[in-house]
Amino acid sequence: MEDLKKSVTNIVHSMYNFDCSEIVSLTRPPKPEYGDWALSLPLKLASLLKSPAIDIAQSIASALLELDGVQDVYVAKPGFINLKLSREHTTGIISEVLEQGSSFGRNTTQSSKKINLEFVSGNPTGPLHLAHTRWAAVGDSIARILINCGADVTREYYINNVGNQIHLFSESVYARALSKSLPKDGYPGEYVKDIARRIQCEFPNIIDLSYEDAIKIFRKRSWQIQIEEIKKSCIAFRVNFDVWFSEESLHEPDRFGKSQIDKALARCKQNGYLFQKNGAFFIRTTEFGDDKDRAVLRSDTSYTYYAADCAYYLNKINRGFSDLVILVGADHHGYVKRFQAMSNIFHVDSENNRKNVQVLLGQMVSLKNKRQSKREGNVIGLSEIIQSVGVDPLRFWFCRYPIDTPIDLDEQHLKKRSNDNPVYYVQYAYARTRSLIRSANLLQMEKFGFFPELLVHETETALVSLLYDYKTVVIDAARFLQPHRVVRYLESLAGAYHKWYDKCRIIPRKGILDKSEAELVNTRLELNRAVGQVLYNALDLIGVSAPERM
């Protein structure tokens, strides 16, 4: 489809000297008899070119008829174009899939980008919870899709190891080591006791130290041990971060006594966006749509979180990233304007160097029939939910929905081995393709050749059309940072495959009777192989396994 879109773009440019690349789109007609693709572009061009849509449609249609692979073009009022591709062109996708194998679907649409993708970034004060699990699945899948489209992607985890929560966490661990009650608003949970025991094993005499000396050790080791556990959980969930960035490093002075935060605020001052009010310092973020100017230095000379955010942003820019993508919870909606403000403030002298900053706001996740409370210490952690449900169902389910859609997770449903469980339905389709291939290998069917013109059943036409769609689905998923497009495609392809499997006997029960039947069987087996390959490739984009047997 992308090649066809490029052809349409070139036709319009040559006819009208107009670049329509941003508005051209191809869709599937509501009925197969209307053709393979529908184009509503003339309706959009009519007002732009000051010409009747039907006339534009007729002109474009005439040029489309000259393209290789286009069998017929129909124009309908007020300015729609329907295209029918030749049988050879559409079924050619089967050979393309089989020739390219695991590379099918890869492209270079994002090759000009060096992207920093920050996600999860849960505070190192406890295990990752359900919402973090969602960000892990979605963030890693976005990375996989972008890499598939040629981008240079760095997966990054920001460790919030500075501030009151870290202090309270270390105090909680220290209290558990002394078998004392928790401080006010302290952290409950068995994991706090586990960390306390581990620190005591590392430093056997720590409880004999003064509070001042002991708390220094607890402050450092508590979050470090928790991060070690978080790393293990992420790896078990098939998420591997390239960079674990410590917020603490932003506060550390260089040999001249200046921290990265100091340098970032100096840059803000140099560009005219830093001002003082009531003894504190603020950045003029309201000039870029924020609801209020953000404090960066309090009157007691301590830095705010936004000061560290500014330094972290500048750190990413200095590492050469062209695009910054940040996944946060919906409760961080204010981050959008703040990060956009940074992009303007730090690049005021150069419009061309302004960075593309995208903040993706994700809705929360609830667990059906289970109440969770972090303060009560009964939050469901990533490791626990993996043990209960498994990696594949979780990753599939979390990527199945747009990130701004709340999810109510049903553990029992995800454990079902039935067709009403989407991940089982898709994986079972792949396992079926592999089972047929094993059976075909015993029959040595390859010698009978491949004749795509034999694929005339309506279920085969539907399958071929879906194979044809795959590359565009991947390109759009990367462009819009939406893994759910891949998941929904997988469900459509699996559904079409199961329907084909049930309607068409691929390998006859009574054996192959003659040469013509053998040719049809082998041709269908090639379609089967192509579907299996695309299922495998798409599952890999969301980090879900493709089982050989089920």
Curated annotation (Swiss-Prot):
It catalyses: tRNA(Arg) + L-arginine + ATP = L-arginyl-tRNA(Arg) + AMP + diphosphate. This is Arginine--tRNA ligase. GO terms for biological process: arginyl-tRNA aminoacylation. Keywords: Aminoacyl-tRNA synthetase, ATP-binding, Cytoplasm, Ligase, Nucleotide-binding, Protein biosynthesis. It is found in: Cytoplasm. PANTHER family: ARGININE--TRNA LIGASE, CYTOPLASMIC, ARGINYL-TRNA SYNTHETASE. GO terms for molecular function: arginine-tRNA ligase activity; ATP binding. A motif ('HIGH' region) lies at residues 122-132. The keyword Cytoplasm applies. InterPro entries: Arg-tRNA-ligase, Arg-tRNA-synth_N, Arg-tRNA-synth_N_sf, ArgRS_core, DALR_anticod-bd, Rossmann-like_a/b/a_fold, tRNAsynth_Ia_anticodon-bd. The lineage of its organism: Bacteria, Bacillati, Actinomycetota, Actinomycetes, Micrococcales. Its EC number is 6.1.1.19. Belongs to the class-I aminoacyl-tRNA synthetase family. GO terms for cellular component: cytoplasm. It comes from the Bacteria. Monomer. Its main location: cytoplasm.
